[in-house]
Amino acid sequence: MPRRIKLGHHYYYLVSVDELISGGYRGKNVAVEGTVGDKPLVEFLPMELPSYRATFNMDGIRVEFAGSPCIKVGDRVRVYGRFLGDCIMASAIETEGAMFVTEE
């Protein structure tokens, strides 16, 4: 059984990218460490409540985050979020210098 860590009000399974790809954690809260593989795409969403959405690839897994984290290609990050099978809907991104968190 993998280790669980707490962030905010939720617990996250600390797993590797290989464990995610095997498919055992679909729909679960996970924490994964990896390297940002491509330029993060930060989109402005001009709605009634304007917001930002960042999308990037981390070791072969797509990550979506509701915000604009200050990360770049090659950064080592830990992503906290729900694994949906093909991507992680991140609720927090931890870098060496900062922690970026969305509202819960």
What does each model-identified segment do?
Residues 1-104:
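OB-fold and OB-like single-stranded nucleic-acid-recognition modules
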